[in-house]
Design a protein with these regions (language model features):
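N-terminal mature ectodomain segment of secretory-pathway/periplasmic proteins
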Residues: 30-34, 38-113, 196, 203
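Short, aromatic- and cysteine-enriched interfacial helices/patches
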Residues: 3, 69-77, 148-152
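Solvent-exposed helix/loop surface patches that form functional interfaces
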Residues: 29-32, 96-177, 181-183, 202, ...
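N-terminal secretory signal peptides that target proteins for export/translocation
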Residues: 1-8
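Short, acidic, Ser/Thr-enriched surface-loop or helix-capping motifs
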Residues: 39, 169, 193
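Boundary at the C-terminal end of the N-terminal hydrophobic targeting segment
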Residues: 22-29
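Bacterial N-terminal signal peptides
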Residues: 9-22
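Low-complexity, intrinsically disordered Gly/Pro/Thr-rich segments
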Residues: 186-188, 192-202
Length: 216
């Protein structure tokens, strides 16, 4: 069960979300749908579908993502998360989340103050430095941070990031991508295309490698 819970946290906390935010500009009044697959140790075990909706000013308003994971047709666990974020000027101002992690429930809230974040996780107060950033791989700015925090528990995570250029084949197309390797308290590798859209996310857990590959 420990491995399954790590798989849940590693692969799905970022994906099974309902997010409201204001960030980068796109064409107004449209929605995008993207699909991908989840692999564990190279074997396909699940799927990902997320929809981005844009407001009248072209800002991202909502990001809805659903994912499932099973082996041999058996559902391994249940993970659901509703997450609300508000961003201004490229910075997170507040966040609210409710998560069910295979029967364990988390309720978290976070507000940005003048110098730090103040929040609550399951009725326990917490504080985070003002420069902490959510561990959300859909957001390109995650690669510019040294202090992240867990979206479910709000636990701070110190990271180091190394960047490199690569090419990747997706649906028989060769893409130029940026690769970012996270080490420290959070170990992951993330690939973005030239439009700074997420292409691939890989995360090691004890004895396994979990990969999420988005379709073109």
């Amino acid at each position: 069960m420990d491995v399954l819970r790590l798989l849940t946290w590693a692969t799905l906390m970022t994906w099974v979300t309902l997010i409201t935010l204001c960030s980068s500009a796109y064409a107004a009044g449209r929605a995008e749908n993207r699909f991908g697959t989840i692999h564990v140790d190279g074997r396909k075990t699940g799927t990902v579908h997320y929809t981005i909706e844009y407001g009248e000013k072209g800002d991202v308003e909502t990001l809805r993502t659903r994912a499932s994971l099973s082996i041999l047709g058996i559902k391994l666990f249940n993970f659901e998360q509703n997450l609300h974020e508000e961003w201004r000027g490229g910075g997170l101002r507040l966040m609210r989340s409710r998560t069910e992690d295979d029967g364990t429930h988390y309720s978290a809230s976070l507000n940005r103050g003048p110098e730090k974040y103040k929040g609550v996780v399951n009725d326990k107060p917490i504080e985070l430095p003002g420069h902490a950033f959510p561990a959300s791989v859909w957001h390109y700015n995650v690669v510019r941070q040294s202090l992240l925090f867990d979206l479910m528990t709000l636990k701070p995570m110190n990271v180091r990031i190394a960047r490199s250029d690569e090419t990747m084949t997706v649906n028989n197309k060769t893409l130029a991508v940026e690769r970012f390797d996270f080490t420290g308290d959070w170990k992951a590798t993330v690939w973005f295309d030239q439009k700074r859209q997420l292409v691939k996310f890989e995360y090691p857990v004890p004895g396994h490698t979990v990969t999420i590959q988005l379709d073109d």
